[in-house]
C-alpha cells in the first residue's frame, strides 16, 4: 500500500460526510466525483475508501471518480497508479479549462440543481486542495494578493457550473491568519473572504482544523478542511469530526517507512535538510 503515499496525501475519515451525503441524496447510488488540484489523489483516496490503515478498516464508499485535474505531470502519473480509472488525468492549466468542452468530452450534465432525481451524468461532489504556497508560513504569505492565492475562484467556477450537492476543500492553517487588506479593500483573513464567497454562491459552509499527525501520519500537517452543502437542500452542516488516534503517541518517519525500509540500501539514501 506504500505506493499510495505522497506528500499531499490526506487521510480523511468521511463517515459523517458520507452519512450526510447519503441522507441528502436519499438513494443508494454512486456519487459522481470531480477532483481539482488532485495531486497524487490523497483526498480522493480518503473518499474512495476500501483500505486498511493502522489496523482500522475503511469501507469502500460508493463513488465514481469521473474527472481529475492537476498541472503537475508527475503527480498525475502517481494518481493513475493509485486509482483504477479508464481516463487520463487532465493536465490542462485550470485557468484555461473550457467547461463546455469538458462536458462534451466526459458527458457531464451541468447544473442539475432543479432535477427531481439524481442525474447519472451530474456531478454530486467536488473535491479540491487549491494551492497553498501563498498562505504557508514557509512562503512570503502574499495570500489572495498573489495570483496563486486566487485559484479558489477556479474551484468556484467549477462549483457554480456543476452545482454539486457537496464540496470539500482543504488548505494550510495559515489561511486563517493571512490578511488581505489590499484585496477589494476588505480587512479580513483569506479564510473569511473565501468562506463568504462560497456562501454567496449558494452553499452553507463550515471549516475545521485537523492535524494529520493526530491521525497517524508521521508528519505534522495542520490543514483547514472546508465543507460546503448546497443551501437549497435545506441542511445545516453538523459534522462530528473523528477523534485523534495518535495525539499523544505520534508516529515517526521510521514508523511510516518500516514496511519498505528493508527494500533499500540505506547507505545510498542521502540525508535531506530543509531550508527556508
Where are these regions (language model features)?
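Conserved short alpha-helix immediately C-terminal to the canonical SAM/SAH-binding motif I
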Residues: 74-78, 151
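Conserved acidic residues
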Residues: 72, 90-98, 209-213
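Conserved acidic E/D residue at the C-terminus of a beta-strand in Rossmann-like folds
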Residues: 67-73, 170-174
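S-adenosyl-L-methionine
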Residues: 77-114
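Class I S-adenosyl-L-methionine
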Residues: 105-120, 132-276
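S-adenosyl-L-methionine-dependent DNA methyltransferase catalytic core
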Residues: 1-65, 197-200, 223-276
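N-terminal Rossmann-like NAD(P) cofactor-binding module of classical short-chain dehydrogenase/reductase
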Residues: 124-127, 168
